[in-house]
Amino acid sequence: MPVDPFVHLHVHTEYSMLDGAAKVGALFAEAQRLEMPAVGMTDHGNMFGADEFYQQAKKTGIKPIIGIEAYLAPGSRFHKKPVFWGEAKQRGTDEYGEGGDVSGAGAYTHMTMLARNATGLRNLFTLSSRASMEGQYRKPRMDRELVAEYAEGIIATTGCPSGEVQTRLRLRQFDEAMQAASDYKDIFGAENFFLELMDHGLPIERSVREGLLKIAKELGLKPVATNDSHYVTADQAESHGALLCVQSGKTLNDESRFKFDGDGYYLKSAAEMREYWDKEVPGAADNTLLIAERVESYEDVWSFQDRMPRVTDGSGKTERQLLEAEVEQYLPTRYPEGATQECLDRIKVELDVLDTKGYCAYFLVVGDLTRWAKSQGIHVGPGRGSAAGSLLAYILHITNLDPLEHGLIFERFLNPERDSPPDIDLDFDDRRRDEVLQYAIDKYGRDKVAQVITFGKIKTKAAIKDSARVHHGQPGFAIADKISKALPPPIAAKDIPLSGIVDPQHERYAEAAEVRNLIETDPSVSQIFDTARGLEGLIRNAGVHACAVILSSQPLMGTVPLWARDDGSIITGWDYPSCEAIGLLKMDFLGLSNLTILGDALKMVKANHDREIDLSNLGLDDAKTYELLARGESLGVFQLEGGGMRELLKRMQPTEFADIVACNALYRPGPMEVNAHNDYADRKNGKKPVEPIHPDLDEPLKDILSETYGLIVYQEQIMAIAQKVAGYSLGRADILRRAMGKKKKEVLDQEFEGFQAGMREQGFRDEAIDKLWATVLPFAGYAFNKSHAAGYALVAYWTAYLKANYPAEYMAALLTSNGDNKDKMAVYLAECRRMGVKVLSPDVNDSLNDFTAVGSDIRFGLSAVRNVGSNVVASIAKVREDKGRYSSFTDFLDKSETVACNKRVIESLIKAGAFDSLGHTRMSLAQHHEAAVDAVIGLKRQQALGQFDLFGGGDDAGGEESSSPLAHLQFTPDEWPRKQMLSYEREMLGLYVSAHPLDGAERLLAPYQDTGIAELVGGEREAGKDQVKIAGMISGIQRRINKNGHPWAIVTLEDLDASVEVLFFPKSYEMFADCLVEDTAIAVKGRINEREGTISIFASDAVPVDISAAETDPGTSPAFVIKVPASRVDRSLVAELKRTLQAHSGTVPVHVKLQGPRGVTRLALSSDYFVSTENGLQGELKGLLGAGCFETVL
């Protein structure tokens, strides 16, 4: 017998974060299976899921009923204190197992609200947004005043047992419950307000039912049956319980954990719902159909409208006319000698396209933002993405590359055949990005500008970890780690989904055999895995997109849901694709750290050299810059610092800007797979001939391919080829380019027909056509956007220019930018040593907050010292400026403000060496600083009361220092042993600065290593090599016990340049535990392990290394052997090698091994070329000859 339908109106999806476990797609799939005509969505306090819910409904044909389970303040939404309605004895937990008074500890009640039409949905957007902005107190709360203002188009119910009416009934306040229901009846209308009934087997639900039905009868209201659905199917109850434990931090066996009492919190079938409700409360289930029938289409909410901000000057000019006026205004700033006809023609073409597409306002807005930022001294990137191909963007100072000069194509950015909107990403100094955002808010309206939401999801490994914790608590992490390590390695930073592990149809199923074996043999793993599958992919939290900003011509309130963060920033409740789909303008305001580095470096250049460098007008022909790149010394240079990239630069020997652009485009997996990067380098340097694709195409394609030596490197080249030989428009050519990139055979076959016909019309033979198509097709899959490559190449050139010409200033800025990354700091400090730039310890007289260039040296910033906050640094610098440099330690204490006279701060500064220049040893100051600070603080307090002068009181302030209570302190010349001093320095700075315990020990460690740690962690190891030998000093040991009771250890091993973790598992730990002593040198052999971009070593062998000879007898050095491929030997290399050796003159003999096809020839150099292996020799040799170019022979 057919069952009447039922519509679920109280449904929580995963957007009820860490409370709802129903994925929207799965929810609709189940609703389809159950043949439901409609389904509702009522997430807790937000409408973030409305767009996904609506789109899924359209796909399935199920009617969407979009709503919210709202939080209502018990009084005013502006009142942010608990409110209780009952007697004190009714609070806490009542006989039904829930709080007997207002929920949320007196903060809110609940109400279910459903949008009846588009107006109602917009009103729900507004209500939820204002609740977040104005009513946030534990939850985002509305109040009756707000609900009454926006009640139009909304159907409401009394909600769950925590609703206002139910709460009053629980408190035995029937009159108040009746009054509340009457008030809401008046607000929404009798036909739009229902009494909501639930039953999950809880006494609290049934205890209020009689009162609700009585109120319904007396007020003429209808009851409606709902199920408080939080997951899709009954078998997901356990996963939902685990999700609640993730939210609360509890475990499943914790009796105090938050859990759902009762059962049935899933999408029940119509039969299940009607079987109960048709008997208990006839008509309650039918009313779900009544509500569903009354809900109208929301289509208008999702209709696309041009919501781009409008621009006017009040004169009545069109936006095109305003744009033309700006072009005319700024054209002379770009072409002071006058624009060419080519330039003027292109301006018109671009203006016409923008006007036709309706994007003139967009360019006016973007131009305004970038020019304002530049006027405020905020460094702006030269352009990224295809926007750099626009001449108008260049003229308006949006970008900084002349597309005519660099061969960049506007049609790659926008063309008449292209439907997608233009997208100009803006890079700003990352410390000042927020200023640009605030300007946009001030200019275009706080109600029309918002940042964009993102959703953090529970990914594969996090799901495993969460599941392990909720089942086993802290000990579960060991099991989670075991499972995670058994997973196949991630591809493109994505792990195999848990479903793929057990799905034979999944493409990576075969790789997951180890995980399946664990699941089959270990019940704990099986349990964790099953729960993790239920957690994986659910939304964990909401965040803010790193760069996306929405701008609108109309208020965003009511257009999309909004969310107010604790800091007051307004965020869209939908992600940016959803916002763009309804016509909102999305822009990217990116914070680029390299622009901050450039800005800091330029300030120091101005201060130290009195030179104002305007990067926008910097020539691209600086010889020192290209020489630096050709030597591969690009560590710290934007986009060019990786080990492989440095090798490519040395092979390429760049001589012009186009080479840097090509490097950016070629050093990627696609081109490298076909060796295009090396082909470019070899063709450029004459090692390989430049061959035409086909003889018939040599002349036609010469202008297009000559800059890349006959190779197709850029997407723009594919477009230009189609235009030149097939007669395509550039817009049509862009469609061809995109089709080629997608590689769909049926599409490609169709495109080839048009391409072939076009070439035949141009007179080309089929042989040439087929050869060109066969050549272009694979290249199209990885050809790069030249505009983007050129924009980033310009930033790369700027950073390389400063490193080559102002090394101290640039490296100081680079160190400041990476102050929070100790691994990178170590690498860059090593690079400073290689460059001959000395990094000086922090100093209370010379240091500022950040690293600063002092002559040709760099001074450490005081903010890098542990326990020294920015307020202390500011105080030290201000006092120094107001009262003069500190002449002694006591002078420092005398002059300093109380904030800097703190024992912990002073001790940290002493250990970091910040007082070294004042004449006392660190050890002596450490012995006396506490007594000195006590004396000074006491006197400063008295002085603040007008009682004493620090050094003697009264008018005798200039008297003898012997009258000072500090005069009795006896500072001795004793100093800590070097090892201890360096240990303290590292403790305070995170790094060794004044010296390194391994200084002079390179020659002693060299026989035990085949690679340096910096090369290892920087990815410069040989391809396919998984075994490595390294040597260094142990700077940290974490000793652990595994679940079987066996000890193991994680050892931090560092050399002069970098550090890496070495794992000694139980077997190797047992063999080598005696070698594992902090601050001792050790050599390790092991297997390279790389997970999520982090390198570690699994040790298989270890041996202690005696480096005492580094200090006691440097004259007994073994020979230092330099390996040189014979094929590379020429006069310039020999001259550079001589210069390098003589620059590091010392006592270590040098041998040269010439490696040729017929064997190795060893040459012993004369004593004129003996070296010191300290202070950067090895780094310079690597820069000249490549990694692995030296060894030591005893």
Swiss-Prot record:
Q: Where in the cell is it found?
A: Cytoplasm
| SUPFAM superfamilies to which the protein is assigned, alphabetical | PHP domain-like (SSF89550)
What ranges are recorded for DNA binding? 1028-1102
Which GO BP terms sit in this record? DNA replication
Q: Which reaction does it catalyse?
A: DNA(n) + a 2'-deoxyribonucleoside 5'-triphosphate = DNA(n+1) + diphosphate
In its UniProt record, a GO molecular function of this protein is: 3'-5' exonuclease activity
GO CC list: cytoplasm
Q: What are the entry keywords? A: Cytoplasm, DNA replication, DNA-directed DNA polymerase, Nucleotidyltransferase, Transferase
Identify the EC number(s): 2.7.7.7
Summarize the subunit comment.
Answer: DNA polymerase III contains a core (composed of alpha, epsilon and theta chains) that associates with a tau subunit. This core dimerizes to form the PolIII' complex. PolIII' associates with the gamma complex (composed of gamma, delta, delta', psi and chi chains) and with the beta chain to form the complete DNA polymerase III complex.
Query: Could you identify this protein by its name?
Result: DNA polymerase III subunit alpha
Organism for this UniProt entry: Saccharopolyspora erythraea (strain ATCC 11635 / DSM 40517 / JCM 4748 / NBRC 13426 / NCIMB 8594 / NRRL 2338)
Q: Which gene encodes it?
A: dnaE
